[in-house]
A protein has these predicted regions:
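Alpha-helical elements of the RecA-like P-loop NTPase motor core of helicases
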Residues: 14, 36, 82
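Short acidic/polar alpha-helix capping motifs at helix-coil junctions
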Residues: 22-25, 43-48
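Extreme N-terminal starter segment of soluble prokaryotic enzymes
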Residues: 1-4
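Acidic, metal-coordinating helix/loop segments flanking the phosphotransfer/catalytic sites
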Residues: 29-45
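CheY-like receiver
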Residues: 45-113
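Two-component/phosphorelay signaling modules centered on CheY-like receiver
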Residues: 6-33
Length: 114
């Protein structure tokens, strides 16, 4: 079973988990929890579901450990799209999260969409 790490607010993680039932999900809301989890095992992808600078800091933390890992970033601020591009984020999308956005992200990276 593929593992997807969700780094985001608890409510957003719960919404995402509804659509990711076929995956082992680990959800973290603090960067201090995210980094050790990334170092323990390489996930199939990381989904950053944070707004503004908090989301960018999460992406930077992932990129320091896994420069080539698929990263999907959901933000509430489209102004962070240039930073997403600079940080080689694979998929940048604006909140709110919904089923269509999740399914698009899954299909784009070769995951089986439930």
């Amino acid at each position: 079973m593929k593992t997807i790490i969700l780094y985001g607010y608890p409510g957003e993680c719960e919404i995402s988990e509804q659509y990711l039932k076929e995956y082992k999900i680990q959800c973290f809301s603090e960067q201090e929890e995210l980094v050790p989890a990334l170092m323990e095992t390489r996930p199939a992808a990381v989904w950053v579901i944070m707004e503004k600078a908090a989301g960018m800091e999460g992406v930077i933390a992932v990129r320091r450990i896994y420069p080539d890992l698929p990263v999907i970033w959901f933000s509430n601020d489209g102004g962070f799209a240039p930073q997403a591009y600079r940080l080689h984020v694979n998929y940048f999308m604006l909140m709110p999260i919904n089923e269509d956005k999740i399914m698009t992200a899954l299909k784009k990276y070769g995951f089986h969409a439930p």
